[in-house]
Amino acid sequence: MKKKFKLQFKVGKTFKDKRGWLKKILDGNFSSCIEIYSKKGSVRANHYHKKDKHFIYIIDGEILYFYRDRKKKAKTRIKLMKKNDLFFTPAMQEHMAYFTKNTHFLAFSTRKRTQFDYEKDLVRVNMQNYRKVKAAITRYK
């Protein structure tokens, strides 16, 4: 039986002591971790990856996240992701991020993020022209 797609994952509890604190965000085999800061009102992604899969962990801010499974020709779905949220993007899933606030996040990828490798695996789309996406962004402007 095929596993159902899971978008959002739980982050571990914060452990505190006199030295400070620690929190497990994610276990896994990753080829890269990118730290990204995006300004309110900006758009990132707007593409899909042929093979790469990645997790996003939001340190601070909010992302209005749009996603659609290309293999199943599914409808576009929307989810508001907030501080401390962890979510997954599989290969072949169109995705776009609209930042409703200034946002600081980490992207954990299964493939190398050299520009050459990244561009070779990437297919650009134009999700901001989808009617549902336009309507959702308009509500946040």
Positions of the model-derived regions?
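Glycine- and acidic-residue-biased ligand/ion/polar-headgroup-sensing regions
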Residues: 51-69
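A short glycine-rich, His/Asp/Glu-containing loop-to-beta-strand
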Residues: 12-46
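His/acidic/aromatic-lined binding-pocket segments of jelly-roll/cupin-type domains
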Residues: 47, 53-58, 79, 86-87, ...
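Double-stranded beta-helix
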Residues: 71, 100-141
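Short acidic-glycine-tyrosine-enriched beta hairpin
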Residues: 70-91
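Tight coil/turn sites that cap or link beta-strands
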Residues: 38-41, 83-84, 90-92, 102
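N-terminal leader/capping segments at the start of a protein or of a new domain
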Residues: 1-17
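Short beta-strand His + acidic residue motifs that chelate non-heme Fe in jelly-roll/DSBH
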Residues: 22, 46, 65-66, 89, ...
